[in-house]
Amino acid sequence: MAVAAAAAATAMSAAGGGGASAARSISRFRGCLAGALLGDCVGAVYEAHDTVSLASVLSHVESLEPDPGTPGSARTETLYYTDDTAMTRALVQSLLAKEAFDEVDMAHRFAQEYKKDPDRGYGAGVITVFKKLLNPKCRDVYEPARAQFNGKGSYGNGGAMRVAGISLAYSSVQDVQKFARLSAQLTHASSLGYNGAILQALAVHLALQGVSSSEHFLEQLLGHMEELEGDAQSVLDAKELGMEERPYSSRLKKVGELLDQDVVSREEVVSELGNGIAAFESVPTAIYCFLRCMEPHPEIPSTFNSLQRTLIYSISLGGDTDTIATMAGAIAGAYYGMEQVPESWQQSCEGFEETDVLAQSLHRVFQESS
């Protein structure tokens, strides 16, 4: 193993499987949703920028820090969340209301959230789905998504960006996979869309356990995805798009190869893994950001902790910055816990208090009662 990968493995072990003590602790639950929110709010500033300079991101996040000895945030203007957080919250609210996954309730909450607050940056495709779901004549909540793109369904990252709550509510791998898929299929019917949501949910699931090494983390993800992507629908969907067989598995292998290199440019990461709105161009990228940033980064000051470093690095890759950062933030937050969520960043982001209440409620309903 190269120096970089060995250092990442050491970082995981040194953190004791994460800085948040016990597996599935309340600190990890809170850190997960907080990390997702911070990634969305901080990343949204740069969304759709093809290239983002690291210096610009560092300047942006440094503006959140107060002067030494001054509490709170230095910002006077709030950083607003996007559809990523709006959908994440709707998913969690449905899980809490039903104390289980309920596709009808969740679909209606997604659609009602859009209707109530449509200016959060929703894509045109998913708006069509929501409008159909709002029609009282809609009898099958999965049908609008299946009809997308001439019946092929969407392979965007919208199912993955909001999925963290599934990993918090369900503790078994089987349940995480099942309900990540079902929740994603409400808007993303292509296997290339919902398999991305499953991969993201599994990454959060493993982070909540505090997996002991980056190598083991990747091995487990790869084992699950190779099995999932072997099914007939996944093979067909990849073939129809002219992609390699098992696109997620192949990208996870690339993640491992990049981690084995001591120095990797951000341009190479984007070239190899992507930074786009397709789930296969963003979920593996978010996982790479989390694993790469377990160790110090030469261009990111050591005054930033591992969670902050993950978000800064994610955003510096450009492209779909808010979604890649929200996914990387959910994984990192689940791993490091609430201890690494800086108060100044919390106070800069819209909706932090509500998000924190949702995380604590999830822990009480699904973890403490189990």
From Swiss-Prot:
Site, as annotated: Glutamate flap: 47
Annotated tissue distribution: Ubiquitous.
Gene3D superfamilies found in the cross-reference section: ADP-ribosylation/Crystallin J1 (1.10.4080.10)
Primary site of residence: nucleus
Cell compartments where the protein resides: Nucleus; Cytoplasm; Chromosome; Mitochondrion matrix
EC number: 3.5.1.-, 3.2.1.143, 3.2.2.-
Phosphothreonine modified-residue sites: 70
Obligatory cofactor(s): Mg(2+)
Any one GO CC term of the record: cytoplasm
Regulation of its function: The protein undergoes a dramatic conformational switch from closed to open states upon substrate-binding, which enables specific substrate recognition for the 1''-O-linkage. The glutamate flap (Glu-47) blocks substrate entrance to Mg(2+) in the unliganded closed state. In presence of substrate, Glu-47 is ejected from the active site: this closed-to-open transition significantly widens the substrate-binding channel and precisely positions the scissile 1''-O-linkage for cleavage while securing tightly 2'- and 3'-hydroxyls of ADP-ribose.
Keywords per UniProt: Chromosome, Cytoplasm, DNA damage, DNA repair, Hydrolase, Magnesium, Metal-binding, Mitochondrion, Nucleus, Phosphoprotein
Binding of Mg(2+) 1, residues: 82-84, 322
GO molecular-function term, one example from the UniProt record: hydrolase activity, hydrolyzing O-glycosyl compounds
One of the protein's GO biological processes: peptidyl-serine ADP-deribosylation
InterPro entries, sorted: ADP-ribosylglycohydrolase (IPR050792), Ribosyl_crysJ1 (IPR005502), Ribosyl_crysJ1_sf (IPR036705)
Null mutant phenotype: Knockout mice are phenotypically normal and fertile. 1 hour induced brain ischemia results in 100% fatality within 24 hours. 30 minutes of induced brain ischemia results in an increase in infarct size in the cortex, hippocampus, and striatum. Increased number of cortical neurons with nucleus-accumulated poly(ADP-ribose) and higher abundance of poly(ADP-ribose) in general.
Keyword Metal-binding: yes
Annotated binding of Mg(2+) 2, by residue: 47, 320, 322-323
Residues the entry annotates as binding substrate: 83, 152-158, 188, 241, 277
Free-text remark on how the cofactor is bound: Binds 2 magnesium ions per subunit.
Enzyme class: hydrolase
PANTHER family: ADP-RIBOSYLGLYCOHYDROLASE, ADP-RIBOSYLHYDROLASE ARH3
Subunit record text: Monomer.
Function text: ADP-ribosylhydrolase that preferentially hydrolyzes the scissile alpha-O-linkage attached to the anomeric C1'' position of ADP-ribose and acts on different substrates, such as proteins ADP-ribosylated on serine and threonine, free poly(ADP-ribose) and O-acetyl-ADP-D-ribose. Specifically acts as a serine mono-ADP-ribosylhydrolase by mediating the removal of mono-ADP-ribose attached to serine residues on proteins, thereby playing a key role in DNA damage response. Serine ADP-ribosylation of proteins constitutes the primary form of ADP-ribosylation of proteins in response to DNA damage.
Family named by the database record: Belongs to the ADP-ribosylglycohydrolase family.
Protein's recorded name: ADP-ribosylhydrolase ARH3
Provenance organism: Mus musculus (Mouse)
Lineage of producing organism: Eukaryota, Metazoa, Chordata, Craniata, Vertebrata
Gene from which the chain derives: Adprs
